[in-house]
């Protein structure tokens, strides 16, 4: 798309952001057409790229739609991480480049913050959080020869990781919309949440371990030019209440054997999952993804 959305302003609010509700409806339709349509597009080589405003959008959308993506390439951007949690990008390739002299809206400082965050996460989770994030020395916002030419060569051979056995989902809101599914996880309740929850799933053999916490943010550092927060402390607290659905296929566990689901270290379900056509139908209707047609489904109380 060669331009930002129309910048109509109503009641002091501008509608030219790529992550806003009206654009999400379009993204959802595009994703469905790509993943279930007759196009020649490989659903495992689907990327978001963007420059400037498009960089903000692609970084946000990467965190929101990571389960559909092979990778993302924001250029000359930098989004506050409260809007685009790095944790959600565990299974995609993430490439971000911003000039060291690009200080408007804290772009250089926010890019440096993202680099530090991805390095922290990659060290804690080897094999995940594949990234190339650079604050390019001497580059301004529009220094094309220094910023633009590394992104596609680095991403070109990346492919989507389907059915990963480690998933982190910080279920954030984008313009009033919450996704109800992410990778193989599903939120049965339809009402909007009153808190931001994090779901961290690790599958080992036939054991599914899931940590569920509430997260809150406290800004700890600000950039000088505009006073925008660039660093946060995250506080996690245990939660109770609600339900969580887990779709399962043979890509994730051995469905002929007993499966154990633990929530925050306590056994929440154990048994041999029933294989039902309705689970295939429901997972297709939820994800619109040929690689996520799951015959088994388990729902647990939190």
Give each language-model segment a name.
Residues 53-54, 76:
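N-terminal low-complexity, intrinsically disordered tails enriched in Ser/Pro/Gly
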Residues 71-156:
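The feature captures the conserved acid-bearing segment of alpha/beta-hydrolase catalytic domains
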Residues 120-302:
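Alpha/beta-hydrolase-fold serine-hydrolase catalytic core, especially in secreted/extracellular enzymes
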Residues 57-61:
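Hydrolases whose catalytic domains are alpha/beta-hydrolase-1, hotdog thioesterase
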Residues 13-52, 63-68:
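Gly/Ser-rich "nucleophile elbow"/oxyanion-hole loop immediately N-terminal to the catalytic nucleophile
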Residues 6, 52-53:
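Short, solvent-exposed turn/loop segments enriched in Gly/Ser/Thr/Pro and often Arg
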Residues 1-10:
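Conserved alpha/beta-hydrolase
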Residues 11-19, 104-111, 222-223, 233-235:
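Short, flexible/disordered intra-domain loops and linkers
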């Amino acid at each position: 798309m060669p331009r930002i959305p129309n910048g109509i302003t109503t009641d002091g609010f501008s509608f030219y952001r790529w992550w806003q509700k009206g654009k999400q409806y379009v993204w959802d339709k595009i994703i469905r057409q790509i993943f279930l349509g007759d196009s020649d597009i490989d659903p495992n080589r689907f990327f978001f790229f963007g420059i400037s405003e498009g960089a903000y959008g692609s970084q946000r959308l990467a965190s929101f739609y990571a389960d559909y993506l092979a990778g993302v390439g924001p250029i000359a951007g930098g989004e506050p991480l409260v809007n685009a949690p790095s944790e959600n990008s565990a299974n995609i390739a993430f490439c971000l480049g911003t000039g060291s002299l690009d200080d408007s809206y804290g772009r250089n400082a926010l890019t440096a913050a993202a680099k530090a965050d991805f390095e922290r996460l990659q060290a804690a989770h080897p094999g995940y959080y594949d990234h190339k994030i650079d604050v390019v020395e001497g580059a301004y916002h529009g220094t094309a020869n220094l910023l633009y030419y590394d992104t596609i060569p680095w991403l070109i051979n990346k492919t989507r990781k389907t059915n990963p056995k480690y998933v982190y989902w910080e279920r954030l809101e984008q313009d009033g919309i919450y996704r109800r599914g992410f990778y193989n996880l599903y939120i049965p309740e339809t009402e909007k949440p009153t808190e931001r929850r994090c779901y961290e799933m690790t599958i080992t053999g036939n054991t599914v371990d899931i940590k569920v916490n509430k997260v809150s943010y406290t800004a700890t550092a600000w950039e000088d030019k505009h006073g925008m927060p660039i660093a946060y402390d995250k506080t996690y607290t245990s939660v109770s209440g609600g339900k969580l659905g887990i779709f399962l296929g043979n890509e994730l566990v051995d469905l002929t054997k007993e499966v154990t689901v633990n929530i925050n270290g306590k056994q929440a379900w154990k048994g041999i999952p029933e294989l039902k056509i309705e689970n295939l139908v429901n997972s297709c209707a939820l994800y619109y993804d040929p690689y996520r047609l799951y015959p088994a489904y388990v729902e647990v109380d939190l």
